[in-house]
């Protein structure tokens, strides 16, 4: 598992668009599901992506959650999982870290 948390001072829609564009540039990436909420002056978006990891030889998922209250900053949390191999220990997590790096490069 790898995790990225950021606080961004820009528009919610701009951040969401950059996330979606960055992830979907991968040939094997798919948007598995999504959910969007609005309540009073808050917004939340959840995206679950999956892609094939050539390094790990398996599929890796990434959950991205964006949250904004009013005109405050956009909070982003991205967590990848599923890229390790082995039954009892987490080894070979390159795929998880590489998937997360697709966001690091655009945020």
What is the predicted function of each stretch?
Residues 86-107:
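A conserved amphipathic terminal alpha-helix motif
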Residues 10, 14, 59, 94, ...:
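Conserved active-site and cofactor/substrate-binding residues in soluble primary-metabolism enzymes
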Residues 2, 12, 22-24, 44, ...:
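N-terminal catalytic or cofactor-binding beta/alpha core of small enzyme domains
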Residues 56-91:
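Beta-strand/loop substructures that line and gate deep hydrophobic ligand-binding cavities in soluble
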Residues 5-6, 34-36, 75-76:
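Short hydrophobic/aromatic-rich motifs at helix boundaries and adjacent loops
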Residues 20-63, 70:
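Ser/Thr-rich, low-complexity intrinsically disordered terminal regions
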Residues 1-27, 31:
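Terminal, regulation- and interaction-focused segments at domain boundaries
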């Amino acid at each position: 598992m790898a995790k990225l948390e950021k606080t961004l001072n820009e528009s919610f829609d701009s951040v969401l668009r950059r996330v979606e564009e960055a992830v979907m540039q991968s040939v094997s990436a798919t948007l598995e599901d999504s959910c969007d909420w609005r309540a009073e002056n808050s917004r939340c978006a959840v995206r679950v992506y999956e892609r094939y990891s050539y390094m790990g030889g398996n599929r890796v998922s990434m959950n991205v959650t964006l949250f904004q209250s009013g005109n405050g900053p956009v909070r982003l949390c991205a967590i990848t999982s599923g890229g390790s191999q082995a039954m009892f220990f987490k080894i070979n997590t390159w795929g998880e870290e590489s998937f997360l790096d697709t966001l690091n490069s655009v945020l």
